[in-house]
A protein has these predicted regions:
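Short beta-strand segments at enzyme active-site cores
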Residues: 7, 45-52, 137
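A short alpha/beta connector and helix-capping loop motif
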Residues: 19-39, 44-48
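Short, basic/glycine-rich phosphate-binding loops at helix/coil junctions
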Residues: 14-15, 50-55, 73-83
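Generic N-terminal amphipathic, Lys/Arg-enriched alpha-helix
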Residues: 5-20
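A short acidic, helix-capping loop that chelates divalent metal ions and anchors anionic groups
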Residues: 14-18, 56-59, 144-147
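Active-site-adjacent betaalpha module
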Residues: 2-4, 31-42, 61-182
Length: 182
């Protein structure tokens, strides 16, 4: 069984002073970096960095050719690692991610990145729908608080609601510490 790591949208706009600052992105990125390093040290060449580039300027962040859209320094890809550019929350939608995974015979994916409630959720569900055994490293993900009408949902609750919904049916959800013990 061949395994790939998918690193989603760990980009500058999600960090302090970015245009769409998340809660605790530094902690999530540091945990993602540990998982990336594990892949690199264990001769796992199947690392896919996904970068969201806004196709509509109205989005207000991840605008083309801006510092905010660049991959954060904590998780910079190496020259030989795969780069995927996306324009939608689902990392598979209108990208070559699936074809590249199939070319390499990948059957299992490990997912880390941002935002838990959008791009992580959409990508994990799509991966399972496409037949990949999927693991989500939950503490290598970050999100933000959400609101609906007069209700505000804190980021931690948003995060755990989404990872709880994904756990079992869609993914094996584990911590970076548990992953690194393997």
């Amino acid at each position: 069984m061949s395994t790939a790591l998918i690193v989603i949208d760990i980009q500058n706009d999600y960090f302090p002073n970015g245009k769409m600052e998340l809660v605790n992105p530094d902690k999530a990125a540091a945990n993602a970096a540990k998982v990336i390093e594990w892949f690199r040290q264990n001769n796992k060449d199947n690392i896919f960095h996904v970068q969201h580039i806004a196709s509509d300027p109205a989005l207000g962040f991840f605008l083309p050719d801006t510092e905010g859209s660049e991959i954060h320094e904590t998780v910079l890809p190496l020259e030989h690692e795969n780069m995927i550019t996306k324009h939608f929350p689902n990392s598979f939608l209108k990208t070559d991610l699936e074809s590249k995974l199939r070319e390499k015979g990948i059957t299992k994916v490990i997912v880390v990145g941002m935002m838990t409630h959008l791009c992580i959720d959409a990508t994990v569900r799509a991966a399972v729908d496409l037949g990949y055994e999927t693991t989500l490293i939950e503490d290598a993900c970050a999100t933000m608080e959400l609101s609906y009408q007069d209700k505000v949902v804190p980021a931690e609750q948003v995060h755990y609601a989404f990872v709880s919904a994904l756990n079992g049916m869609y993914a094996n959800v584990i911590s970076s510490g548990d992953f690194l013990k393997k």
